[in-house]
Amino acid sequence: MKNKYFLSFIFFINFFIFSFNLKATPDSFADLVEELLPAVVSIASTTIVENKNNQPIPRFPEGSPFDEFFKEYFDNERPSSPKQRPMIGLGSGFIVDNSGIIVTNSHVIEGADEITVILHNQNEYKATLLGRDPKADLAVLKIDSGNESLKAVKWGDSVTIRVGDWSIAIGNPLGLGGTVTAGIISAISRDIGNGPYVKFLQTDASINRGNSGGPLFNINGEVIGINTAIISQTGGSIGLGFAIPANSAKKIVTQLKDFGRTKRGWL
């Protein structure tokens, strides 16, 4: 009889542990993502560049029929070719204050003559650059949304992150705004040679070009990192994504918002 009760007790304990592990793995992120999406934005940066289509006229021997042909061709084509053209860059960002303060990567808006922020509902607003820190690869923007209310994210504590924790990336990869991917934290304090100021969180959540500047969330819906870089031989995601830790970013974001630059101490 004692053995029977003992076996029943063991079965109950194992069942309890199994049930607990099932609860630790969410059935879906859908409810959480629905709440987070309005706080994530797409960013389009427009830079005016010189048109490089004005090739020199090929040289031919004097009297060659090609000489006259190419002179006539280039004379007819060049006037119709504009001297300048817009170049569009795409990235991601997220709202940190419902007054219109937005965080992204510095490289997303570097050299931009015009910055446009596209909200999740597809409404577009011109953005003003409040400040950027190229060394930390962070930038802070400001939009005036008028009467439209904005949803802001909550910062999380990246110091408490452990390898194996869930991570959720939301952004604008390849111009596909509102794309959501999930994975785990693969490593912390990762040095990828991008400078001495930041050690990155590594995640296997799929991150591609255009995700730069977007948020990396924990399972509680808090921003624990800013997606910044990938390592890939193909240019696409192979599960090696890197994010600036939230605790490092928060201090810099505050300074960029208040002063337009980062103040660093020197010895």
What spans do the regions from the language model cover?
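Bacterial N-terminal signal peptides
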Residues: 8-18
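Serine-dependent protease modules
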Residues: 22-267
